[in-house]
Protein backbone atom coordinates (compact mmCIF):
# COMPACT_ATOMS: atom_id res chain seq x y z
CA UNK A 1 0.00 0.00 0.00
CA UNK A 2 1.30 3.47 -0.89
CA UNK A 3 0.75 5.88 2.02
CA UNK A 4 1.73 9.52 2.49
CA UNK A 5 1.86 11.14 5.95
CA UNK A 6 1.53 14.87 6.56
CA UNK A 7 3.07 14.89 10.03
CA UNK A 8 4.00 18.54 10.76
CA UNK A 9 6.24 17.65 13.67
CA UNK A 10 4.10 14.88 15.17
CA UNK A 11 6.83 12.54 16.42
CA UNK A 12 4.39 9.69 17.03
CA UNK A 13 3.46 9.74 13.33
CA UNK A 14 7.11 9.77 12.28
CA UNK A 15 7.52 6.62 14.38
CA UNK A 16 4.51 5.09 12.61
CA UNK A 17 6.13 5.90 9.25
CA UNK A 18 9.27 4.04 10.36
CA UNK A 19 7.26 1.07 11.65
CA UNK A 20 5.28 0.73 8.40
CA UNK A 21 8.25 1.18 6.05
CA UNK A 22 9.24 -2.53 5.93
CA UNK A 23 5.69 -3.52 4.94
CA UNK A 24 4.25 -0.58 2.96
CA UNK A 25 5.55 2.12 0.62
CA UNK A 26 5.44 5.22 2.80
CA UNK A 27 6.49 8.86 2.49
CA UNK A 28 6.39 11.76 4.93
CA UNK A 29 5.59 15.46 4.46
CA UNK A 30 7.90 16.99 1.81
CA UNK A 31 6.52 19.03 -1.09
CA UNK A 32 3.20 19.19 -2.93
CA UNK A 33 4.81 17.32 -5.83
CA UNK A 34 4.87 14.17 -3.67
CA UNK A 35 1.06 14.03 -3.70
CA UNK A 36 0.32 11.94 -6.79
CA UNK A 37 -2.68 9.92 -8.03
CA UNK A 38 -0.85 6.68 -7.17
CA UNK A 39 -1.10 7.34 -3.41
CA UNK A 40 -3.71 5.09 -1.77
CA UNK A 41 -4.01 6.93 1.55
CA UNK A 42 -3.04 10.35 2.89
CA UNK A 43 -2.77 10.52 6.69
CA UNK A 44 -3.12 13.87 8.44
CA UNK A 45 -1.35 14.76 11.70
CA UNK A 46 -3.34 16.28 14.54
CA UNK A 47 -1.94 19.81 14.12
CA UNK A 48 -2.24 20.05 10.32
CA UNK A 49 -4.52 22.79 8.97
CA UNK A 50 -7.00 22.20 6.09
CA UNK A 51 -5.14 25.00 4.27
CA UNK A 52 -1.95 22.91 4.15
CA UNK A 53 -0.87 22.71 0.47
CA UNK A 54 -0.45 18.92 0.53
CA UNK A 55 -3.87 18.41 2.09
CA UNK A 56 -5.43 20.66 -0.55
CA UNK A 57 -3.59 18.80 -3.33
CA UNK A 58 -4.82 15.45 -1.99
CA UNK A 59 -8.38 16.79 -2.00
CA UNK A 60 -8.00 18.09 -5.55
CA UNK A 61 -6.88 14.63 -6.70
CA UNK A 62 -9.72 12.92 -4.84
CA UNK A 63 -7.36 10.80 -2.74
CA UNK A 64 -8.56 8.99 0.41
CA UNK A 65 -7.66 11.26 3.36
CA UNK A 66 -7.59 10.02 6.95
CA UNK A 67 -6.93 11.53 10.33
CA UNK A 68 -4.33 9.37 12.03
CA UNK A 69 -7.04 8.01 14.37
CA UNK A 70 -9.19 6.85 11.46
CA UNK A 71 -6.10 5.45 9.73
CA UNK A 72 -5.10 3.44 12.80
CA UNK A 73 -8.55 1.88 12.77
CA UNK A 74 -8.28 1.00 9.07
CA UNK A 75 -4.77 -0.39 9.56
CA UNK A 76 -5.81 -2.62 12.46
CA UNK A 77 -9.48 -3.35 11.77
CA UNK A 78 -8.82 -7.10 11.41
CA UNK A 79 -7.04 -7.20 14.80
CA UNK A 80 -8.28 -7.03 18.37
CA UNK A 81 -8.07 -3.32 19.14
CA UNK A 82 -7.25 -2.49 22.76
CA UNK A 83 -7.49 1.15 23.87
CA UNK A 84 -6.23 2.62 27.13
CA UNK A 85 -8.09 5.88 27.79
CA UNK A 86 -8.38 8.31 30.69
CA UNK A 87 -7.19 11.77 31.61
CA UNK A 88 -4.33 10.35 33.67
CA UNK A 89 -2.44 7.08 33.96
CA UNK A 90 -2.65 6.02 30.31
CA UNK A 91 1.06 5.85 29.66
CA UNK A 92 1.81 4.17 33.00
CA UNK A 93 -0.73 1.40 32.38
CA UNK A 94 0.47 0.98 28.79
CA UNK A 95 4.06 0.64 30.01
CA UNK A 96 3.07 -2.10 32.47
CA UNK A 97 1.13 -4.02 29.83
CA UNK A 98 3.92 -3.78 27.24
CA UNK A 99 6.51 -4.81 29.84
CA UNK A 100 4.44 -7.90 30.66
CA UNK A 101 3.85 -8.85 27.02
CA UNK A 102 7.55 -8.41 26.27
CA UNK A 103 8.52 -10.44 29.36
CA UNK A 104 6.64 -13.42 27.93
CA UNK A 105 7.63 -12.69 24.29
CA UNK A 106 3.99 -12.14 23.28
CA UNK A 107 3.53 -10.29 19.99
CA UNK A 108 1.50 -7.09 20.16
CA UNK A 109 1.33 -4.01 17.96
CA UNK A 110 1.06 -0.70 19.75
CA UNK A 111 0.77 3.04 19.19
CA UNK A 112 1.69 5.48 21.95
CA UNK A 113 1.15 9.24 21.85
CA UNK A 114 4.52 9.96 23.48
CA UNK A 115 7.64 7.97 24.40
CA UNK A 116 7.64 5.89 27.59
CA UNK A 117 11.19 5.41 28.83
CA UNK A 118 13.11 3.43 26.22
CA UNK A 119 9.95 2.05 24.59
CA UNK A 120 9.51 3.22 20.96
CA UNK A 121 6.20 4.98 20.38
CA UNK A 122 5.04 2.51 17.75
CA UNK A 123 5.37 -1.12 16.71
CA UNK A 124 3.69 -2.84 13.77
CA UNK A 125 3.74 -6.35 12.37
CA UNK A 126 1.11 -8.02 10.17
CA UNK A 127 1.27 -11.17 12.32
CA UNK A 128 0.30 -9.65 15.70
CA UNK A 129 -3.19 -10.52 16.92
CA UNK A 130 -3.57 -7.49 19.20
CA UNK A 131 -2.91 -3.77 18.90
CA UNK A 132 -2.67 -1.55 21.98
CA UNK A 133 -3.48 2.12 21.41
CA UNK A 134 -3.00 4.96 23.87
CA UNK A 135 -6.29 6.79 23.50
CA UNK A 136 -5.86 10.53 23.96
CA UNK A 137 -8.63 13.10 23.57
CA UNK A 138 -6.85 15.47 21.16
CA UNK A 139 -9.33 16.74 18.57
CA UNK A 140 -9.15 15.06 15.17
CA UNK A 141 -8.51 17.64 12.40
CA UNK A 142 -10.99 15.93 10.06
CA UNK A 143 -13.80 14.41 12.13
CA UNK A 144 -13.61 17.14 14.81
CA UNK A 145 -14.09 14.59 17.59
CA UNK A 146 -11.57 13.40 20.20
CA UNK A 147 -9.13 11.03 18.53
CA UNK A 148 -9.91 8.11 20.85
CA UNK A 149 -13.49 7.99 19.55
CA UNK A 150 -12.20 6.75 16.18
CA UNK A 151 -10.56 3.46 17.23
CA UNK A 152 -13.71 1.36 17.88
CA UNK A 153 -12.01 -1.01 20.33
CA UNK A 154 -13.02 -4.53 21.29
CA UNK A 155 -11.37 -4.10 24.69
CA UNK A 156 -10.92 -0.77 26.46
CA UNK A 157 -9.74 0.51 29.82
CA UNK A 158 -10.59 3.90 31.30
CA UNK A 159 -8.45 4.97 34.24
CA UNK A 160 -9.88 8.35 35.24
CA UNK A 161 -12.13 11.12 33.94
CA UNK A 162 -11.36 14.79 34.43
CA UNK A 163 -14.34 16.90 35.45
CA UNK A 164 -16.06 18.40 32.41
CA UNK A 165 -15.09 15.59 30.04
CA UNK A 166 -17.89 13.18 30.93
CA UNK A 167 -19.64 13.47 27.55
CA UNK A 168 -16.44 12.71 25.63
CA UNK A 169 -16.02 9.50 27.60
CA UNK A 170 -19.69 8.53 27.39
CA UNK A 171 -19.40 8.86 23.61
CA UNK A 172 -16.17 6.82 23.69
CA UNK A 173 -17.88 4.01 25.61
CA UNK A 174 -20.54 3.93 22.90
CA UNK A 175 -17.85 3.37 20.25
CA UNK A 176 -16.80 0.01 21.72
CA UNK A 177 -17.87 -2.91 19.57
CA UNK A 178 -21.03 -4.61 20.82
CA UNK A 179 -20.12 -7.50 23.09
CA UNK A 180 -16.79 -5.86 23.88
CA UNK A 181 -15.17 -5.47 27.30
CA UNK A 182 -14.84 -2.25 29.29
CA UNK A 183 -12.44 -2.16 32.23
CA UNK A 184 -12.91 0.88 34.44
CA UNK A 185 -11.54 2.29 37.68
CA UNK A 186 -14.54 2.10 39.99
CA UNK A 187 -12.85 4.43 42.50
CA UNK A 188 -13.58 7.30 40.08
CA UNK A 189 -17.20 8.14 40.92
CA UNK A 190 -18.01 9.91 37.63
CA UNK A 191 -16.48 7.08 35.60
CA UNK A 192 -18.40 4.47 37.59
CA UNK A 193 -21.69 6.24 36.79
CA UNK A 194 -20.86 6.43 33.08
CA UNK A 195 -19.86 2.79 32.83
CA UNK A 196 -22.86 1.47 34.72
CA UNK A 197 -25.35 3.63 32.80
CA UNK A 198 -24.17 2.82 29.27
CA UNK A 199 -26.73 1.29 26.94
CA UNK A 200 -23.98 -0.29 24.84
CA UNK A 201 -23.99 -4.08 25.12
CA UNK A 202 -20.67 -4.54 26.92
CA UNK A 203 -19.11 -6.75 29.53
CA UNK A 204 -18.25 -4.38 32.38
CA UNK A 205 -15.19 -5.17 34.51
CA UNK A 206 -14.58 -2.69 37.37
CA UNK A 207 -11.22 -2.65 39.13
CA UNK A 208 -9.81 -0.92 42.20
CA UNK A 209 -6.42 -0.16 43.70
CA UNK A 210 -4.42 -3.34 44.27
CA UNK A 211 -3.96 -4.26 47.96
CA UNK A 212 -0.49 -3.33 49.11
CA UNK A 213 1.54 -2.10 52.04
CA UNK A 214 4.68 -0.02 52.55
CA UNK A 215 7.56 -1.22 54.70
CA UNK A 216 11.11 0.05 54.93
CA UNK A 217 10.76 2.19 51.81
CA UNK A 218 9.53 -0.74 49.70
CA UNK A 219 6.00 -1.35 48.44
CA UNK A 220 4.73 -4.90 48.82
CA UNK A 221 1.88 -6.14 46.63
CA UNK A 222 -0.47 -8.41 48.56
CA UNK A 223 -1.22 -11.44 46.37
CA UNK A 224 -2.93 -14.81 46.99
CA UNK A 225 0.58 -16.26 47.35
CA UNK A 226 1.72 -13.68 49.88
CA UNK A 227 3.52 -10.34 49.80
CA UNK A 228 5.64 -9.48 46.76
CA UNK A 229 8.18 -6.61 46.71
CA UNK A 230 7.84 -4.13 43.84
CA UNK A 231 10.16 -1.61 42.21
CA UNK A 232 7.37 1.00 42.05
CA UNK A 233 5.45 2.69 44.85
CA UNK A 234 2.47 4.89 45.62
CA UNK A 235 -1.29 4.39 45.65
CA UNK A 236 -1.74 5.74 42.11
CA UNK A 237 0.79 3.25 40.76
CA UNK A 238 -1.04 0.45 42.57
CA UNK A 239 -4.27 1.54 40.90
CA UNK A 240 -2.60 1.53 37.50
CA UNK A 241 -1.09 -1.89 38.26
CA UNK A 242 -4.54 -3.29 39.00
CA UNK A 243 -5.87 -2.01 35.68
CA UNK A 244 -2.85 -3.39 33.82
CA UNK A 245 -3.33 -6.79 35.48
CA UNK A 246 -6.93 -7.10 34.32
CA UNK A 247 -6.02 -5.88 30.86
CA UNK A 248 -3.24 -8.48 30.60
CA UNK A 249 -5.61 -11.20 31.78
CA UNK A 250 -7.90 -10.32 28.87
CA UNK A 251 -4.86 -10.62 26.57
CA UNK A 252 -4.13 -14.17 27.72
CA UNK A 253 -1.69 -13.55 30.61
CA UNK A 254 -2.90 -15.22 33.81
CA UNK A 255 -2.70 -13.57 37.22
CA UNK A 256 0.35 -15.45 38.51
CA UNK A 257 2.29 -14.80 35.30
CA UNK A 258 1.44 -11.11 35.53
CA UNK A 259 2.84 -10.98 39.07
CA UNK A 260 6.04 -12.66 37.88
CA UNK A 261 6.50 -10.04 35.16
CA UNK A 262 5.46 -6.96 37.14
CA UNK A 263 7.95 -7.71 39.91
CA UNK A 264 10.70 -6.50 37.54
CA UNK A 265 8.82 -3.42 36.29
CA UNK A 266 10.27 -0.04 37.20
Residue map of PLM features:
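A short, acidic/glycine-rich surface segment
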Residues: 117-120, 139-144, 215
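Active-site beta-alpha connecting loops in nucleotide-dependent enzymes
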Residues: 4-17, 21, 25, 162-165, ...
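Acidic, Mg2+-coordinating active-site environments of NTP-dependent enzymes
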Residues: 29, 34-66, 73-79, 98, ...
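Walker A (P-loop) phosphate-binding motif
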Residues: 1-8, 12, 16-19, 68-116
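Conserved beta-strand positions in the Rossmann-like core of class I SAM-dependent methyltransferases
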Residues: 25-27, 109
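Switch II (G3) loop of P-loop NTPases
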Residues: 129-142
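A generic local secondary-structure boundary/capping motif
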Residues: 119-123, 144-148, 171-173
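Glycine/threonine-rich beta-strand-loop-alpha-helix active-site module
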Residues: 107-132
Amino acid sequence: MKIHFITEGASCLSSLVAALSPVHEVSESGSVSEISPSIEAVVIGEHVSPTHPQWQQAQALGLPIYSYGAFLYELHKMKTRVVIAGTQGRSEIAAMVLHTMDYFSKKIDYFLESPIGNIPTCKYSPEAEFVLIEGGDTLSPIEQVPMFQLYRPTLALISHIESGKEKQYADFINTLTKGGILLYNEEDAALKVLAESTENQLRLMPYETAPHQESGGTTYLITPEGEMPLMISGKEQMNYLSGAKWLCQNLGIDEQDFYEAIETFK
